[in-house]
Amino acid sequence: MHARIREDLKAFPPHLVTLVYLGDYIDRGPDSAGVIQRLCKPAIPGAECVLLKGNHELMLERFLASPEAAQSWRQLGGMETLLSYGVDVKAALAGDEAAPMAAELLKKIPAPHRALLASLKVSEMIGDYFFCHAGARPGVSLDRQDPADLLWIRHEFLSSDYAFEKIIVHGHTPVEQPEFHPNRINIDTGAYATGRLSCLVLSSDEQRLICVGD
């Protein structure tokens, strides 16, 4: 995807480039640690980079802080993340306590990875668009949104035609093809399961897609 973005920038050079990532960098895929390592390095020279938090990063955060209270994370893709950092998951498979695994994971996550994960934002507003992982609660102004909704919301947001102050750009709920609605744009094409990754290109007068894995 980054190679395609670089090609696009050469063909259509803008004055300013901001890359916004919508979260869920870890879990389910085979190399969560590799993804975080990639995000630690500038992908596009000269571009501003905004990294948003997804609910899977939140689950990792909770697992490290309170292992026993967040064991469900392991069933939602956390096992793959543990493996990618070289954690011995035999205890997890045996149903033993989660605390030793959390302690081992904390030791094995490199400091730059921890710093990146700690720096993730829950939203970003740029021009006519509001970026977040999952969506926003209808009827609530964007500057008063609950962070939990920005990371987790589904039905109440997806089923609503509420006109927010900005167009919401989000992921979280996989769709076969990116969806464009008057109040929101969903670009989550379920890369972990489909191999399709979608990038939305926005400018003052344009909305278009760069897709890989089609």
Label every model-predicted segment.
Residues M1-I36:
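N-terminal active-site segment of His-dependent metallophosphoesterases
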Residues R4, V35-L39, P67-A70, A148-D149, ...:
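Glycine-rich, phosphate-binding/catalytic loops in enzymes
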Residues K10-P13, I44, M125:
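Residue-level signal for alpha-helix termini/capping positions
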Residues H15, R28-S119, F157-S159:
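Active-site neighborhood of divalent metal-dependent phosphoester bond hydrolases
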Residues D24, G54-N55, H172, D188:
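Active-site glycine-centered loops adjacent to acidic/histidine catalytic or metal-binding residues
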Residues D27-R28, L58, P138, V175:
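Active-site micro-motifs of SAM-dependent methyltransferase domains
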Residues M79-V87, A91-N186, G190-R196, L202-G213:
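Acidic, His/Gly-enriched loop-helix segments that form or flank divalent-metal centers
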